[in-house]
């Protein structure tokens, strides 16, 4: 599945057709792509926050303890794995509304490859500088949205108009999920689950 990485970034329309035509179970998709790609941000984030620390403005860098960073990295990885499957399941469920009867495996592939730019921008977490993550994160998010709108009509085998509406619905669900995650993180942070910092 990693063989589709370059194509999905530089020639998405053609690559989506190849991804659509690949017979791939959810397990194979995860083993060949999601498990690897989803590990980039947690691993880089672990080393970035323990070795260099977060830099916010002109303040001194803030490092996390190894134990605290490890717990966050594992939780981060788990959330990403669950997130890809959840989005795939939601795409599969919503597909009937748009006259798309594709299987769950194809929906999960759509979710996984749409997230490719977001997976790759995880390398920036090796250098946890707030403005740098923000500046590079926004284009990655924008390109993921482009991949979504390009991929839905091809993967779900529906016309462009329904594909646009379907993509917009998926995007709305994704934004709601992101807000829920941020709120949950804030609640945990202020209820005794804040990370441990070191000097």
Which stretches of residues belong to each language-model region?
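Juxtamembrane, membrane-proximal amphipathic segments and lipid-exposed surfaces
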Residues: 38, 42-45, 109, 153-154, ...
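Membrane-helix interface segments in multi-pass membrane proteins
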Residues: 44-79, 125-140, 180-199
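Alpha-helical transmembrane segments
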Residues: 5, 83-87, 141, 145, ...
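Generic preference for flexible, low-structure residues
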Residues: 21, 32, 46-47, 51, ...
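Hydrophobic alpha-helical transmembrane segments and adjacent short intramembrane/lumenal linkers
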Residues: 91-92, 98-173, 178-179
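Selected alpha-helical membrane-embedding segments in polytopic membrane proteins
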Residues: 1-99
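Residue-identity detector for threonine
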Residues: 25, 49-50, 97, 114-116, ...
């Amino acid at each position: 599945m990693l063989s589709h990485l370059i194509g999905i970034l530089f020639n998405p329309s053609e690559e989506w057709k190849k991804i659509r035509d690949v017979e791939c179970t959810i397990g194979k998709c995860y083993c060949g792509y999601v498990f690897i790609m989803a590990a980039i941000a947690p691993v880089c984030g672990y080393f970035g926050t323990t070795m260099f620390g977060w830099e916010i403005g002109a303040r001194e860098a803030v490092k996390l303890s190894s134990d605290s960073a490890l717990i966050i990295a594992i939780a981060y990885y788990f959330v990403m794995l669950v997130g890809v499957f959840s989005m795939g399941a939601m795409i599969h469920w919503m597909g009937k509304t748009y006259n798309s009867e594709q299987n769950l495996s194809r929906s999960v592939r759509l979710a996984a490859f749409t997230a490719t730019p977001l997976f790759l921008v995880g390398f920036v977490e090796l250098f946890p500088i707030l403005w740098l993550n923000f500046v590079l994160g926004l284009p990655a998010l924008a390109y993921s949205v482009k991949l979504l709108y390009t991929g839905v009509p091809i993967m779900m085998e529906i016309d462009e108009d329904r594909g646009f509406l379907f993509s917009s619905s998926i995007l709305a669900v994704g934004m709601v999920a992101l807000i829920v995650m941020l709120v949950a993180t804030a609640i945990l942070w202020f209820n005794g689950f804040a990370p441990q910092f070191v000097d």
